[in-house]
Swiss-Prot record:
Residues 111-161, 169-187, 207-221, 426-442 have a biased composition (Basic and acidic residues). It comes from Glycine max. Residues 105-262, 426-480, 501-522 are annotated as: Disordered. Residues 237-279 form a coiled coil. It comes from the Eukaryota. This is Seed biotin-containing protein SBP65. Belongs to the seed biotin-containing protein SBP65 family. The modification N6-biotinyllysine is found at residue 125. Keywords: Biotin, Coiled coil, Germination. Signal peptide: none annotated. Residues 223-234, 247-262 have a biased composition (Polar residues).
Length: 643
């Protein structure tokens, strides 16, 4: 029988390998909810589908316990008590494991039934897949009763009827539907299932006690699973609530922080604004105070400066006024000093002024005669030049006109030469006499007058003469200035009269000539008479006196030099009319010779008068008009005589 049993066991189909793939479930709550559903389904079908394999396994465990003594006595055969004892203990531990995992096996059986329908499902962190399809479903009853091969050998020593050796091995997982052993075991792939096959068939009745115990263990397992599921769900909910609360608190904290920061920013902005306004007001006040103080300081500094400037202006005005008064007083002081000096020396101020005036008169006389002498020389030269020019012009006229021109030219030339020589000699004589008288009078002057510088005397006389004295002043001082002006005027007038007389005498000696000669003489006489009258005019005397007085201010020794320069200018101006006469002589006829000579002399006299008197252009224009009239009159007379 042992051989038959062995052959039957060798024909047993090989177990089907079921691969368990590990898959990680993202959410723990989903897993526990799935386990809860499985628990509910198992409660419904608890009495209907009881897996036989698990019950047989339990029975086999009990039987293994009952026959443990026999097995331990038979195995080894030769006093191997220690090994037998260890093997018995091992079987007991295996039986305990089978008992402990009964509920897990029940759950696995339920899941295996679902897998019979095919498909893939998740259990915990594992993905369960059934291979084989319909074939696997057909082989399921056979898989439930599958066992490990047990080779038993009978021992002939004791002569027992049957003997066997039960060898229990750990093998590979034999369940088609693999369940998860224990809710807490997440990665276990192998489970130990021990099935024992007894050689002697026994009854397969299921004790009631075992069923009750299995039910209780199953309930406890499902209760534990439910508790675990509830705890996990509650934990997830608590975590979710805590996370939600933390997020809400974080949001509230963030909002509150943002509000606080915003309020702080507003407060800081308001404080900055207030500080800026305050600083601006302070700066404005400081600037205002600075500007006002600067303006006040400037006004305070400017006011004294303005006052000083005003005072300085007033002082300058006072100084100018006082300077004017000082000048006037200086002139008066000089006059008084001159008077005091004259009184101290035994002479009155009038006598001293008379002597000074006499000295100036003598000097002016000498200067006048020198000027007259020079003028006479220039006049003679101009007349001679005019005569030569007329002679040249007369040569172009006809024969009769040439004779008349020659006669007229000879007469005029002789007249002018004689008159010029006479005037020249007379002026030279008067000049020498005046100089001798001046030199003779110098030793007779008082010692004090000689010691006084001529510049001081000239300045005193000029200031005293220019500044008119008040009417209530000393009449003796006014008389002194008048004496000086009168003396100089008389000197110039007498010089003019003396220059005029020789020309009159010359014209009187030649009055017995022809009609043409008489007309020429009359023209010359008129010209010379006008010269004398102009030189003797009061206005001429005053202007000449002013010029002489102005030159006297530079000192008595510089009077002759100034007069010499004036006479030189007079001579240059005298040459210009001679050139004009020469130009006119080329275009005039012989009958206009006397007119040309008369006009030349008149122009010379007029130029002399203008240079001496210093008249302006208006007087020169009047002289030109007068010259034109004289020329027109001469032409008219010439035309009447020609007719």
């Amino acid at each position: 029988m042992a051989s038959e049993q062995l052959a039957r066991r060798e024909n047993t189909t090989t177990e089907k390998e079921i691969h368990v793939e590990k898959h990680r479930v993202p959410k723990m709550a989903t897993h526990f909810e799935h386990l809860a559903e499985q628990a509910k389904e198992s409660d419904i079908t608890a009495g209907k589908d009881t897996p036989q394999g698990s019950i047989e396994a339990l029975q086999a465990g009990e039987r293994v316990k009952d026959h443990a003594g026999k097995a331990m006595g038979d195995i080894g055969g030769r006093g191997k008590a220690r090994e037998t004892h260890e093997l018995g203990a091992h079987f007991e531990s295996l039986a305990d494991k089978v008992t402990d995992h009964a509920a897990a096996n029940v759950v696995g059986n339920k899941e295996s039934q679902r897998e019979a329908r095919g498909g893939v499902r998740d259990v915990g962190k594992f993905e369960m897949r059934t291979e084989g399809g319909e074939k696997g479903n057909k082989d399921r009853p056979e898989l439930k009763t599958r066992t490990r091969e047990v080779i038993g050998r009978t021992e002939k020593e004791r002569g027992r009827e049957s003997g066997g050796q039960v060898v229990a091995e750990k093998g590979r997982e034999t369940e088609t539907a693999r369940g998860r052993v224990g809710a807490e075991n997440e990665g276990a792939r192998t489970t130990a299932v021990i099935t024992c096959t007894l050689e002697k068939g026994g009854g397969t009745q299921k004790p009631i006690r075992e069923e009750e115990r299995e039910s209780e263990s199953e309930r406890s397992a499902w209760e534990q699973i439910s508790n675990y599921s509830d705890q996990a769900t509650q934990g997830v909910k608590e975590k979710y609530e805590r996370a939600k609360q933390a997020a809400s608190e974080t949001l509230n904290t963030t909002t509150q922080t943002a509000q606080e920061k915003s309020a702080q920013a507003k407060n800081l902005a308001a404080q900055a604004k207030d500080a800026t306004l305050e600083k601006g007001q302070q700066g404005y006040a400081v600037t205002k105070d600075t500007i006002s103080s600067a303006a006040k300081t400037a006004s305070e500094k400017t006011a004294p400066v303005a006052e000083k400037a005003k005072d300085y202006t007033l002082q300058a005005a006072e100084k100018a006024k006082s300077a004017g008064g000082t000048t006037a007083s200086y002139v008066g002081e000089k006059a008084v000093q001159a008077k005091d000096v004259a009184v101290e020396s035994g002479k009155s101020a009038a006598g001293y002024a008379a002597k000074v005036a006499a000295d100036l008169r003598d000097k002016a006389t000498a200067v006048g005669w020198a000027a007259a002498h020079f003028s006479a020389e220039k006049t003679v030269e101009g007349t001679k030049a005019a005569a030569h020019v007329v002679e040249g012009a007369a040569g172009y006229a006809g024969h009769k006109a040439a004779e008349l021109a020659s006669m007229s030219a000879g007469a005029v030339k002789g007249l002018a030469a004689s008159a010029g020589e006479t005037a020249k000699e007379y002026t030279a004589k008067k000049k020498e006499e005046a100089q001798r008288e001046l030199e003779a009078k110098k030793p007779s002057q008082p010692q004090e007058a000689e010691e006084r510088p001529s510049e001081g005397i000239g300045e005193t006389v000029r200031q005293y003469a220019q500044k008119p004295k008040p009417s209530e002043g000393n009449p003796q001082k006014e008389g002194t200035g008048s004496i000086v002006f009168t003396a100089i005027g008389e000197t110039v007038s007498s010089a003019g009269e003396k220059v005029k007389k020789p020309f009159k005498n010359t014209m009187g000696g030649e009055s017995e000539g022809g009609g043409g000669k008489e007309e020429g003489k009359s023209v010359i006489g008129k010209s010379l008479t006008s010269i004398g009258e102009k030189l003797g005019d009061a206005k001429q005397r005053e202007e000449l006196l002013d010029n002489v007085t102005g030159n006297i201010t530079e000192g008595g020794g510089e009077v002759l030099g100034a007069v010499g320069e004036t006479v030189a200018e007079i001579g240059q101006n005298m040459m210009k009319p001679a050139e004009i006469v020469q130009e006119r002589a080329h275009v005039r006829q012989a009958g206009g010779v006397l007119d040309a000579i008369g006009e030349t002399i008149a122009e010379i006299a007029e130029t002399t008068r203008v240079m001496v008197s210093g008249e302006d252009e208006r007087v020169l224009r009047q002289s030109v008009v007068l010259e034109t009239r004289v020329t027109g009159r001469a032409k008219h007379e010439e035309g009447s005589h020609g007719a």
